[in-house]
Amino acid sequence: MPLHSVIVLVLVLCLGWKSNTQEESLSDFTICAEPGPVIPQGNFITIVCSTSGEYDTVRLEKEGSTFMEKKTEPHGKQHRFRIGPVNETITGYYNCIFEKNYVWSQRSNDLQLKVIKENVTQGLAPGPSMTSDTSWLKTYSIHILTVVSVIFLLCLSLFLFCFLSHRQKKQGLPNNKSQHQRSQERLNLATNGLEKTSDIVMDDSLSEDRQTETWTPVAGDLQEVTYAQLDHDSLTQRTVKDVTPQNRVIMAESSTYAAIMRC
């Protein structure tokens, strides 16, 4: 085999071994973000740097510059960097790099972070416990409002009933008094009418006696009979409705004809 062919073969083998070594070394370093590379503004993010080997120091770089650095834990394979609350300055490309015995490893693949403007309260969804508590509170408040409304309506109805009853009682007292006064006046009028009627009857009877006394019969004269009729209409008009049986008898006697015999 010519010498130059051997030299070319050795160079190819060396280059292949070097490339394999670089690929294996790159696969040993990984970087990721929790919960994800897109973060709402104001939240927190955790960047995880992982390696299969053991190193003394781990560094987080942003676009080739040191961003954060810390000592590794013994036998630790994952190293976390907590960042937040985040803002727009966090946006960019990040890498992980490790150091052991003052020798730095190669950088990991790139991780791009993005910060979006979003309200934190809107981005966080409420949990089931919060939702159940809120629904229970709403139901309880609705029941309370219903009970209070019913009690208020009952109290209002009772108040109106008492008010109307009291008002009717006040209006009924004057009416009763007026009715009593009217009945008393009617009784007084009836009593006065009866007294006047008895006086009239007595006067008529006296005048009747006087007439009988003046018209005495004379002996030897012809017997003449004269009938005198009393004014019955004037007597009956002055009577009242409520007349006792005794007064009725007196009025009947006053309406009879008086016969006077004249000799």
Curated annotation (Swiss-Prot):
Query: What does UniProt give as GO cellular component?
Result: plasma membrane
Where is the organism placed in the taxonomic lineage, from the top?
Answer: Eukaryota, Metazoa, Chordata, Craniata, Vertebrata
Q: In which tissues is it expressed?
A: Expressed in lymphoid and non-lymphoid organs.
Q: What about PTM?
A: Phosphorylation at Tyr-227 and Tyr-257 activates it. May be phosphorylated by LCK. N-glycosylated.
| Name of the gene encoding the protein in the UniProt record | Lair1
Origin, by domain of life? Eukaryota
UniProt modified residues of type Phosphotyrosine: Y227, Y257
Short motif ITIM motif 2, span: 255-260
Topological relation to the membrane, as annotated? Single-pass membrane protein
Please indicate the residue ranges that the annotation assigns to the motif ITIM motif 1: 225-230
Q: Where is the signal peptide?
A: 1-21
Q: What is this protein called?
A: Leukocyte-associated immunoglobulin-like receptor 1
Task: Print the keywords alphabetically.
Answer: Disulfide bond, Glycoprotein, Immunoglobulin domain, Membrane, Phosphoprotein, Receptor, Signal, Transmembrane, Transmembrane helix
Q: Record's InterPro entries?
A: Ig-like_dom_sf (IPR036179), Ig-like_fold (IPR013783), Ig-like_Receptors_ImmuneReg (IPR050412)
